[in-house]
Amino acid sequence: MVMVDALNLGRRLRVRSTAYVAGEPVPFSWPMRTFISRNPLYGLEHMPFEQAVRRGAELFHARMFLPRSDYQRWQREGKVRQDTLAEEIARRAQALPAVPGIDWPRWLQALMQSAHDRDVVVPGVRAPDVHAALHGQPPSAQAVDVAVLLPALEQRLHGLTLPEAVDALWGTRLADELDELVIKSYLDFFDEDQSSWRMPGRERGLFAAWSEIAQRNARMFLRRLHVRRTLGRVQDPESAVVHVMEEMGIDPDAWSAYFTRELTRLYGWTGFVRWRSSAKHYYWAQRYPAEVVDLLAVRLVVGLALLQESARHRRTPVRREQLDALLHERGAECLLRNALHSGEVLPDWAQRIDDTLSRGGSKRCEALLQRYWPLWQARQGQDQAAALRELAAAADATAALEVLSPEDIAGLIQGLQEFARQEGMVWTLAMEAQAIDQLLAQVQVPQDLAAGKRPFAQAWFCIDVRAEPIRRHLERVGDYQTFGIAGFFGVPVGFLGYGKGSESHFCPAVVTPKNLVLELPAELDPEEDDLLSTLGHVLHDLKSSVLSPYVTVEAVGMLFGLDLFGKTLAPLGYSRWRNRIDADKPVTRLLVDKLTREQADSIIRTLQRAMIVKALHAELHIERERVDDDMIRELRETALRHREGPTRLQRTFGVSDKQEAEFIDKLREVYRVDADYASYQLVRLGRIGYSLDEQVNYVHTALTMIGLTKTFSRFVLIVGHSGQTENNPYESALDCGACGGASGLVNARVLAQMANKTAVRERLRGMGIDIPDDTWFLPALHNTTTDAIELSDLVLLPPRHLVYLDRLRNGLRAASRLAAAERMPKLLPQARAIEPAQAWRLAHRLAVDWAQVRPEWGLSKNVYGIIGRRSLSERADLQGRPFLMSYDWRCDPKGRLLENLLAAPVVVGQWINLEYFFSTVDNARLGSGSKAYHNVAGRFGVMTGSLSDLRTGLPAQTVMREGQPYHEPMRMIALIEAPLDFAGRALQSVVKVKSLVLGGWIRAIVIDPTQGYKPFVFNNGQWEERPPLVAPAEEEHAA
């Protein structure tokens, strides 16, 4: 077989870059273990929001707003601001074509109150046919002009891939078959040890490995797909892409758009490959590389084979020019084919059209089209006339409709069609306006703590909306002051947990931590020499058995059987019992400080000595007890080239010169006892811990960020959070997004340990922050599924604090029960009249019930992002809807802290908000459908059934209840407490957030304390002034 000409480097790079750019509208998709919320339209954020949703609907074949009936339900519940609805309708009506006698606002109001969700405009309808139907007349008799009808069909087909175009005209399933075939190949390649079969050659990359297998693949052979014809002629994915595109006759100027269409068909897989190819730390990506161009090449090669196979059996086109020729030479046939397979054919005519197409012949098709098309147009006209009559009656404009000319009717249809694209946006704006009013009605002028008043405890929570209820209840049950901060607490942590074999990242997904924290048994004294040996084992072995070595396979099977019955019949009791028998992990502490050079050198020496002992046993069968420390030291010095000549190995064990030389070489090359590798190890050890300067900086930044620079309590709780669920592939979606979809406890422990250090506090005192000696930073974990708060690292608690521990726990437990009592009725409507203790028990049961598809609502109904002092909103019951970010503009003279909040938590909050927005409006396409049909794919993703696109959004159970939306899709409303010009400068400085606000992706409010706490709402490109906030009542303030 003839090999195509190899592409030169320049052309290969152009193909790769075109493929990369074509995939940019698709957002990254992280593995399910670290579910990260992201805006599904992230790749379109450079556009205004309203323009982006139109483009997103085209790209992802998805709905961007809910059906009208859902918004009408919320309107009846008082969640839609009526005057905003009227204002938006009036404003948009001005841009519609003027039609005599048509009062556009009245018609549009009637449309939005229609009892039907269906579109008011019938696709492809002609105004003269509507006019005739309105007046009970038959349509005008005129010959069907194929040349007039073809351009619309041609334009539609040119927006499709060639397999999709063939499907549209022949009713085949080429595009679906293509998806199914490549998904199976993707599963084989990307599998992370879930499958018992391993695709060979994966280390060479996706396309190379797949092309080797595909040429002898049974699925391809049985399907009679001759991929070998193409694969035998190409050398790499880039040449495969070029070959296929040229074989299909696609104009090079259209390649980028064609690639985008291909890549968005399975945008979950595309998003995963886009993320994976950029994740340099991801083990599987390094071991088995894959790029977007690989993904595209596989699709194109299989797609071409499907086209060729279809051409052999049905004489369908393989090249674009063949399709164009078919449209122009056999236009009537193409129109009939499209009518038959579009799902819009008149039922009585389907069989006749099918028979005629089977018999063929241009004249036969032309004759049938002349008979069928007028009937179809007449039916369209009648359907449109009926819809207009109903709408006119609702608008009290029947008389105005009846006198319209065909030209006027065309203008009416055009206007209604244009408004139909905007209706969802109008509903959304009116809901957001109501939400803004509700927020401004509840927040109040903030008040500082009375001078000298010291709360019993202060607690830092993640900004996550699920923290709002428990913060509110904690403040009301006792003398507690709470703060909100991003859940990684500003400290990116690389973490090597006790008994774990690989590093985990606890920080936002877009950040790579520079520092590594080790978890060690608490009984180890950091000053003891044994710690160095322990570190050597941790860095060398990286393993710890969960079950004792003598536990047999049968015992594990028995435990699984107990799981099956226990989790099903008595989930709560069984969970408690299982936790007791699994509690083999010792109490631990974290190694947060940097190692000294002497410690690092000692660890490396320990590792090298261990490797020499291992080598002696493996290579020369010499046991440890037969060698002494001096011999090991001598071998180490020789391997490092610090000494020359024979070693005691020869004299003691009779090893020859050659054997000794080979052994020394193996020590260097295989066991890495080598000076160069020692330098590398030294660099790696340099990642362990944080320097004193770094620790001071992290603690200082966190304190000033939340405005806590004085009046410290005895207890300062740093509360991370995570969810708890059983049998749920999406469990990481319930954890802390700021920690990369993991628990926030590690970060809380790290920051608390830093803040409790005397050296750190001394440096902070010199920076104007004086933390009292009796203040203790205590890490804790908020379980968002049960609302329990568990204190951590109590072994480090100073004895003088123990007397207050019961009071602290009692307050936390009371707040947790009250929060559960608030949350359970939202989760289970039958639990409305429930006591806090009952709600607490119910929440714990749901958390361990493996049949429970919705143990909590997650972040559903999130809508607000509040940046300001807690006292601004602490008297408000915001129902778990705001991201609460503590901030005091008076502690931020240059605005840098506000800029950081806007650049990180606000942007992440917007991602979360729009993940919920789009997962709600089209759960089938932009969400992930029902959990009931989910299956784990390759241990990295979730599919619906056994074969589907990777499901990247939120499951229906997270955003829907009984088939109706539970989440209310609105854009995030970000409220900032700061002077207007101060906040404006910060918004201008953070380019990304400026773009999001100006583009309408975020709704912004500024409450200006220098102008009597007057709110300013950013709307239509300008700041709109609102009445000042009310001050809290005197008795409230005194309390």
Swiss-Prot record:
Its cofactor is Zn(2+). Pfam families: DabA (PF10070). Zn(2+) binds at residues 462, 464, 721, 736. One of its GO terms (molecular function) is zinc ion binding. The keyword Transmembrane helix does not apply. It is a peripheral membrane protein. It is found in: Cell inner membrane. Its main location: membrane. GO terms for cellular component: plasma membrane. Keywords: Cell inner membrane, Cell membrane, Membrane, Metal-binding, Plasmid, Transport, Zinc. It comes from the Bacteria. Part of an energy-coupled inorganic carbon pump. Forms a complex with DabB. Belongs to the inorganic carbon transporter (TC 9.A.2) DabA family. This is Probable inorganic carbon transporter subunit DabA 2. It comes from Nitrobacter hamburgensis (strain DSM 10229 / NCIMB 13809 / X14).
